[in-house]
Amino acid sequence: MKVAVFPGSFDPLTLGHLDLIKRGSALFDQLAVAVMTNESKNPLFTVEERVAQIKEAVSGLDNVSVITTEGLTVDLMNRIGADYLMRGLRNTTDFQYERDIAAMNNFLDDQCETVFFLAKPEYQHLSSSLLKEVTSAGGDISAYLPANINEALKKRLMEREMLRVKKDNEKAR
């Protein structure tokens, strides 16, 4: 059985991520989407929220599971019996970074095989960080997000704006 892990922070999951998940689910018998913690990215959603959002977005893909973990991806792969690490590449910068990560993973576990998927042209410019930046400045990014995640993002940004206004009002008193 071909089992793969697709790790990422997915904050938020984009249509580019979802496309990779669909393509991976067609290639592998089982695909585990691993929602990782990366506090340096200043997460908009909690890990639990991201897991729930992704589960909803992939609900039609029977061979896809959504899990969360901390620590080394190769350790996760060993725990769940995965032989393949799935990664998406948007550009040469991604390739250089992912090549180095793949080499380190292979050093840590010589059974870890990284499989690269090239992003489709319509998704090559996307990143969760860019989408958060655009939407926080008032831009409409709904064309790049699954519907459930677009709604969650709108709600979260509205909550943050209301909190900011409340703090500003308290300072003005």
From Swiss-Prot:
Main localization (coarse): cytoplasm
Residues that coordinate or bind ATP: 9-10, 17, 88-90, 98, 123-129
EC number per UniProt: 2.7.7.3
Catalytic activity, as annotated: (R)-4'-phosphopantetheine + ATP + H(+) = 3'-dephospho-CoA + diphosphate
GO MF annotation: an example: ATP binding
Intracellular or extracellular location(s): Cytoplasm
Residue sites binding substrate per the record: 9, 41, 73, 87
GO CC list: cytoplasm
Keywords: ATP-binding, Coenzyme A biosynthesis, Cytoplasm, Magnesium, Nucleotide-binding, Nucleotidyltransferase, Transferase
Annotated site residues (Transition state stabilizer) in this chain: 17
Pfam family, one: CTP_transf_like
Essential cofactor(s): Mg(2+)
GO biological process, one term: coenzyme A biosynthetic process
Gene3D superfamilies listed in its UniProt record: HUPs
Function: Reversibly transfers an adenylyl group from ATP to 4'-phosphopantetheine, yielding dephospho-CoA (dPCoA) and pyrophosphate.
UniProt cross-references to HAMAP family, sorted A to Z: PPAT_bact
Family: Belongs to the bacterial CoaD family.
NCBIfam families the UniProt entry points to: coaD_prev_kdtB (TIGR01510), cyt_tran_rel (TIGR00125)
Identification of the protein by name: Phosphopantetheine adenylyltransferase
Species the sequence originates in: Limosilactobacillus reuteri (strain DSM 20016)
Gene from which this protein is expressed: coaD
